[in-house]
């Protein structure tokens, strides 16, 4: 079993902000940095309604006070319900918690983006329920990044090709230097980019992984991912990039 805690204490400001984001007439939008267009947001004050959870062995998942808390004893993926299309950027802040809890391992700040499933009609990742075990995602076509994996000893980027037991890894996307790992209890700014052939992950404004993809994945879902770890996430935003 997993426990989901929904925050019911919505402030007047967060309610009005949410209505502004969801009730804009067609053709109107909110602008982000550099004339980027805000498509989606989650300030984690109104529960987990925008997320689908696949948890291997339960856990505690709650959204309250502006923070999504992911406390999991095993593998878990939280899929953002809205499908995304390139050119797009996904922004959020994330922390690996070290406060003495049973899952406070400081490990595995991971994610999927532009994910589709080769087994599903139309490729919809939400059409198939998975156990949360990592091997269950092999048949996705997606970009995947794992920061501080293997108990905070590796950081890797992969382009999944939709085949079981086939997760290609290029040498330049297999990092092991200390500066590419995770510091405990520190907020990191993550930006994921899918803009035509340009695929990127930036951490605190600095490119960490880059791929010039000649056959880019141009639509799909975003998923937060970790395993036996305790993460906190805040300020989740999705922008359409100019182009």
What are these regions (language model features)?
Residues 1-10, 19-25:
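N-terminal secretory signal peptides
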Residues 9-10, 26-36:
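C-terminal segment of N-terminal export signals and the immediately downstream linker at the start
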Residues 19, 23, 27, 235-240:
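C-terminal alpha-helix/helix-terminus motif
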Residues 32-243:
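Extracellular glycan-recognition regions
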């Amino acid at each position: 079993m997993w426990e989901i805690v929904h925050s019911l204490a919505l402030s007047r400001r967060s309610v009005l902000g949410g209505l502004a984001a969801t009730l804009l007439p067609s053709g109107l939008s909110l602008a982000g940095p550099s004339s980027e267009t805000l498509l989606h947001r989650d300030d984690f004050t109104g529960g987990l309604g925008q997320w689908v959870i696949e948890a291997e062995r339960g856990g505690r998942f709650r959204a309250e006070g502006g923070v999504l808390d992911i406390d999991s004893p095993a593998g878990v993926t939280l899929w953002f319900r809205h499908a995304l299309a390139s050119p797009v950027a996904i922004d959020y802040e994330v922390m690996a918690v070290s406060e003495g809890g049973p899952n406070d391992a400081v490990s595995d700040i991971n994610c999927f983006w532009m994910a589709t499933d080769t087994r599903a009609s139309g490729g919809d990742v939400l059409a198939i329920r998975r156990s949360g075990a990592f091997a269950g995602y092999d048949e996705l076509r997606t970009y995947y990044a794992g920061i501080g994996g293997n108990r905070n000893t590796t950081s890797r980027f992969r382009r999944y090709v939709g085949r079981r037991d086939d997760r290609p890894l290029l040498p330049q996307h297999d990092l092991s230097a200390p500066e590419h790992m995770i510091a405990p209890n520190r907020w990191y700014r993550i930006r994921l980019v899918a803009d035509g052939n340009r695929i990127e992950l930036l951490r605190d404004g600095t490119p960490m992984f880059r791929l010039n993809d000649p056959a880019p994945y141009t639509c799909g879902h975003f998923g937060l991912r970790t395993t036996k770890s305790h993460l906190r996430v805040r300020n989740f935003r999705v922008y359409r990039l100019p182009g």
